[in-house]
Amino acid sequence: MNINFFLKKIIIKYLKFFYIFYDLFIRHKIFINKKCYSQAGEDVFILNKFKKPGFYVDVGCHHPLRINNCHLLYKNKWRGINIDLNKISIEIFNFARAEDVNINMAVSLKKGKIKYYYNKLLGLSNSLLKKKYLPHFDIINSDRLDKIIDRTKFKNRRIDFLSIDVEGKDIDVLKSLDFKRYNPRSICVEIWDSKRGFKKHKVYKFLIKKNYLLVAKKRENYIFIKKI
C-alpha cells in the first residue's frame, strides 16, 4: 500500500475539517443569531408570509449563512433541500444544516453530466460558462429538479419556498420542475433588468403563465406568490 497516498488523504480530510470550522465559527460566527441572512431581507419576507414551518428548495445555495435565503427559515424549524455545484459548499451545509438534504449536483433540463469551470486561485465558481479566467474544470452530474427531489424523502411534497440563484440558468431550473406535483407556493429568482424592463424577461413571462403574482422586488431578486 502507498503510505504517502493514505497520508495525503488524511491531511486533506483534516484540512477540510479545519476550513469548515474556521468558515462557520470564526469567519461567519454561526453561533450568533441574526435577524436576516439574505441579501435584502428576502428570508424575513418569506418567513412573515407563512404561519407554519414549511419545505424549501434552494438551488445554487452556495453557503448556509452568507447571503442565504433559507438559513433563517431553517432556524425557524423549516427543512428542505440545498443543491450546489461546489463540493466544499455542500460539505459545509452537511455540518451547518444536518437536518436538510444537501446535494452536490447541477440542475438541468435532462439527466447528464456538465463541465463545470472554476478558478483554483479564487475558489470554486457557480458558473457553468467557460471563461478565459476560469481555466480549470470538473465533470459533475446533472438532472432535472423534479427528478432530484424525487430521490429524497421530500418526494411529491409541495414546495413552500423555491429559491434559485444559478447565474443565468434560472429559466432552465424552472422548466425542469413538474409544477403539477411540486407547485411552489412562493419563488425567489434573479431577474437582471434589461433595457426593455423585467416584464419582458423570460423568467417573468414563464411565472406569469404559471399563475404567479409578483409581490416583492429585493434588488435583483424577485419574489412571486402562487395565486389561489
Where are these regions (language model features)?
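Phosphate/nucleotide-binding beta-alpha loop and adjacent structural elements of enzyme active sites
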Residues: 1-228
